C-alpha cells in the first residue's frame, strides 16, 4: 500500500499539470486602432472670363503633372465649361487637344436679337456630347456650375441635372446669350454674382481651395462693339466681387493674360501656356500650405 502512495502522488501532480496547461489563457487585447487622419479635400475653383478660360486648361495640366488632383471642381461661365469637361474624366492633355480642335461656331448659335444674340443651345449640346450625355451627379468628379437667378439676383449652384444646360446657364452673358429657363426660373451668367465661386466650393466641403482668377481689368480705350461694351461692364462690376470672393481661397492663381480679349479664340494656345506658367510659379505655395494642413489634421 505504501508503495502505491508515491505513484498516486505522481499521478496527481501530472493531472494537475495537465489541467493547468489545458486552462484557457486570457488573450491579450489588441492595441486600439490608429485613427487615420482624413486627407484634406481639395477644391479647384475656375473663374469666368470667356475666351480667357483656355488658361484653366494650362492650370489643370500643371496641377496634374504634380499629382495635385482636386476632389471637387466649381466653375462660373468659362470656368464651368472647362470644369464640366474636366469633371467628366478628361485629363489636362485631353482638354488641350479638345480646345485646339474646337471651332467657335460649335458653341455659338447666332439668332435675331431677342434678349440675346446667341441662343446657347449649341454650347449646351457641345458639352453634353463631349461628356456622353451624363448629368451633373454622374460625372467622374464632384462638380458644380454657378449661375445667377435673373428674378432674385441670387447665385444658383447647380449640382444635379442636365450638365450642358447648367453650363449654358452659367455662361449666358446678359445681352449676348439668351437667358436659360430651368424648372420655371430664368438664369444668366454666374459672373454677375460669383465670378470666382470660392464660397460654393467651401459649402461643398472643400478644406483647401485653389482658385484660378482669369477676370479682366477694365480696359482704357475704345469699346468697338456691343459685346465689348457688355464685357467691359462685367469687368467693372466684377472687380469688388472678385476681391471679396478670393479672400477665402487658400491659393489664388492669376494667369498673365491681360493682353487676351475675352472674345479672342485665336490665342487659345497662348492662354493655355500662361495657365501652366501661373500654376508653376505658385507650386511652392500650394505644396507648403497643403503640407501644413495635412500635418495639422
Regions flagged by a language model, labelled:
Residues 2-4, 8-11, 21-73, 85-297:
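Patatin-like phospholipase
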Residues 75, 79:
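Gly/Ala-rich beta-loop-alpha elbow adjacent to hydrolase catalytic centers
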Amino acid at each position: 500500500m505504501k508503495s502505491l502512495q508515491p505513484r498516486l502522488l505522481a499521478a496527481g501532480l501530472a493531472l494537475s499539470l495537465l489541467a493547468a496547461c489545458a486552462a484557457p489563457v486570457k488573450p491579450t487585447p489588441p492595441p486600439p486602432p490608429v485613427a487615420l487622419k482624413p486627407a484634406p479635400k481639395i477644391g479647384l475653383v475656375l473663374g469666368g472670363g470667356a475666351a480667357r478660360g483656355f488658361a484653366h486648361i494650362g492650370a489643370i495640366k500643371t496641377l496634374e503633372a504634380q499629382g495635385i488632383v482636386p476632389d471637387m471642381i466649381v466653375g462660373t461661365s468659362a470656368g464651368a465649361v472647362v470644369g464640366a469637361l474636366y469633371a467628366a474624366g478628361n485629363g489636362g492633355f485631353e482638354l488641350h487637344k479638345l480646345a485646339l480642335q474646337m471651332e467657335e461656331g460649335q458653341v455659338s448659335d447666332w439668332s435675331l436679337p431677342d434678349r440675346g444674340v446667341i441662343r446657347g443651345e449649341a454650347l449646351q449640346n457641345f458639352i453634353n456630347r463631349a461628356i456622353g450625355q451624363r448629368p451633373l451627379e454622374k460625372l467622374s468628379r464632384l462638380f458644380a456650375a454657378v449661375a445667377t437667378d435673373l428674378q432674385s439676383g441670387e447665385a444658383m449652384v447647380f449640382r444635379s441635372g442636365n450638365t450642358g444646360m447648367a453650363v449654358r446657364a452659367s455662361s449666358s452673358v446678359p445681352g449676348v446669350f439668351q437667358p436659360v429657363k430651368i424648372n420655371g426660373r430664368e438664369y444668366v451668367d454666374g459672373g454677375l454674382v460669383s465670378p470666382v465661386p470660392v464660397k460654393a466650393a467651401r459649402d461643398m466641403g472643400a478644406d483647401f481651395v485653389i482658385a484660378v482668377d482669369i477676370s479682366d481689368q477694365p480696359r482704357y480705350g475704345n469699346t468697338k462693339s456691343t459685346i465689348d461694351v457688355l464685357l467691359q461692364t462685367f469687368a467693372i462690376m466684377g472687380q469688388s466681387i472678385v476681391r471679396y470672393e478670393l479672400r477665402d481661397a487658400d491659393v489664388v492663381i492669376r494667369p498673365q493674360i491681360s493682353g487676351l480679349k475675352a472674345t479672342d479664340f485665336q490665342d487659345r494656345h497662348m492662354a493655355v501656356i500662361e495657365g501652366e506658367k501661373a500654376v508653376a510659379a505658385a507650386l511652392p505655395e500650394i505644396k507648403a500650405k497643403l503640407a501644413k494642413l495635412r500635418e495639422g489634421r
